[in-house]
Amino acid sequence: MDAILEILDPYVFDYGYAYLFPQQTTQPSYGNSTGFAPSSASKNFDDEYSLNFGSSLPRDDIYRQSASILMIAGFGAAFIYVISAALSYYFVFDRRLEHHPRFLKNQIKQEIQSSFFAIPIIDLLTLPFFLGEVRGHSLLYTNIDEYGWSWLAISTILYMVFNDLGIYWIHRLEHHPSIYKYVHKPHHKWIVPTPWAAIAFHPVDGYVQSVPYHVFVYLCPMQKHLYMFLFVCVQIWTILIHDGDMITGHWLERFINSPAHHTLHHMYFTCNYGQYFTWADNYWGSHRAPMPELDPIHEAIRVMQEKGLADKDGNPIEKSKSE
């Protein structure tokens, strides 16, 4: 998050905070007296700005940082969600699944509403993690030479394994009867999910499943730009595994927790808890391999054929405008 602040502070937030909370001074000032704490991204920033603008909230003010983080996290999550889910829905998701008997009325609208309800609450709950990163309490670092190029690869692997293991057990525990109905059940409202359901869950559910992503950089050093890249990839991956794609038979199925695996999780509840890989499900006996006959599209096509909406091969029948 500090990497994003270093970009947005001098070009966006400095102006905004100077307008909303102007520095109480009548004399031109330079350097740190402008009210801004120095940052690596602004060392070469135009001195004319420092002469004419200033805010009573310096860049290292915890309240300013908190507000900035919430704006970045909220807008960023919404942007990634809308763009990724839209692309997945319109170009990958099989729209015939909307005829499945377990597909809810107005489901997509409900998924989107649930997602936008959850986003700001999750952002607020995760604020302490982001704030700790910005204020230097994590093990994020800037200079690659500090740990070497090989550590980029090693830390990436560790990050994915740590997250996969953590989320597996968090997810599995959420299915315990004493927890499920209070926290995780809202997400399983979508038996036949669309990409819009990726973050359509109880805010506490979204928060606890995100904890491993945040905790990792407090336990293990990671280059901050790599961390931000992987963090964004995680959000996109979460959307992709909700695309309902039941492509089966690929050798990678043995290792990757694919959309097919997660589709089965939504349908059968007690299998495929992993996030990226299948190793945890295999080891702890909760793996269910995707099989062509388990594809929910078969039931959806059957319903469509009964209603005269699909031909014998399952292809949608285009109705004329006169009908």
Swiss-Prot record:
The keyword Nucleotidyltransferase does not apply. It catalyses: episterol + 2 Fe(II)-[cytochrome b5] + O2 + 2 H(+) = 5-dehydroepisterol + 2 Fe(III)-[cytochrome b5] + 2 H2O. The chain crosses the membrane at residues 67-87, 112-132, 150-170. GO terms for molecular function: iron ion binding; oxidoreductase activity. One of its GO terms (cellular component) is endoplasmic reticulum membrane. InterPro entries: Fatty_acid_hydroxylase, Sterol_Desaturase_Related. A motif (Histidine box-3) lies at residues 262-266. Pathway: Steroid metabolism; ergosterol biosynthesis. It is a multi-pass membrane protein. A motif (Histidine box-1) lies at residues 171-175. Disruption phenotype: Leads to a severe decrease in ergosterol production and virulence when ERG3A is also deleted. Results in increased production of deoxynivalenol (DON). Keywords: Endoplasmic reticulum, Lipid biosynthesis, Lipid metabolism, Membrane, Oxidoreductase, Steroid biosynthesis, Steroid metabolism, Sterol biosynthesis, Sterol metabolism, Transmembrane, Transmembrane helix. It holds the Pfam family FA_hydroxylase. Its EC number is 1.14.19.20. The keyword Endoplasmic reticulum applies. A motif (Histidine box-2) lies at residues 184-188. Its main location: endoplasmic reticulum. Signal peptide: none annotated. PANTHER family: STEROL DESATURASE. Belongs to the sterol desaturase family. The third module or late pathway involves the ergosterol synthesis itself through consecutive reactions that mainly occur in the endoplasmic reticulum (ER) membrane. Firstly, the squalene synthase ERG9 catalyzes the condensation of 2 farnesyl pyrophosphate moieties to form squalene, which is the precursor of all steroids. In Fusarium, the biosynthesis pathway of the sterol precursors leading to the prevalent sterol ergosterol differs from yeast. The ringsystem of lanosterol in S.cerevisiae is firstly demethylised in three enzymatic steps leading to the intermediate zymosterol and secondly a methyl group is added to zymosterol by the sterol 24-C-methyltransferase to form fecosterol. In Fusarium, lanosterol is firstly transmethylated by the sterol 24-C-methyltransferase leading to the intermediate eburicol and secondly demethylated in three steps to form fecosterol. This is Delta(7)-sterol 5(6)-desaturase ERG3B.
